[in-house]
């Protein structure tokens, strides 16, 4: 089972233009085996709001994608940050501090026994989490 990093969610949005390895990888998996972190929801929401400020039309398209596709697709499979995740995340910052968002995604994966699917493998090095790069799968 996998937790999708934000870059994988965005790649899967590219209808007809999704990298073939990512598309084939995702098609082989049952949707019930794919999860996202509330951190990815945060990152997507920030991106939508920033784009909407400069391009209302594109902002509306992204808002519709988020509300009609991402959230319904992952309904019941958006993993929250709870006490166990927060405590595990803290251990990932010592002795080497890292990005809070990446550490929270890694901690969520560790607590729930998931593999992180990401293009940014280096962001998750030395966390102890299993990582898969779907672009190379």
Predicted segments, located by residue:
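Acidic active-site catalytic centers that drive phospho-/nucleotidyl reactions
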Residues: 5, 43, 102, 120-123
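A generic structural signal for short hydrophobic patches within well-formed alpha-helices
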Residues: 9, 41-44, 86, 124
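Residues that scaffold the ATP/ADP-binding catalytic core of kinase and kinase-like folds
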Residues: 11-13, 47, 88-89, 127, ...
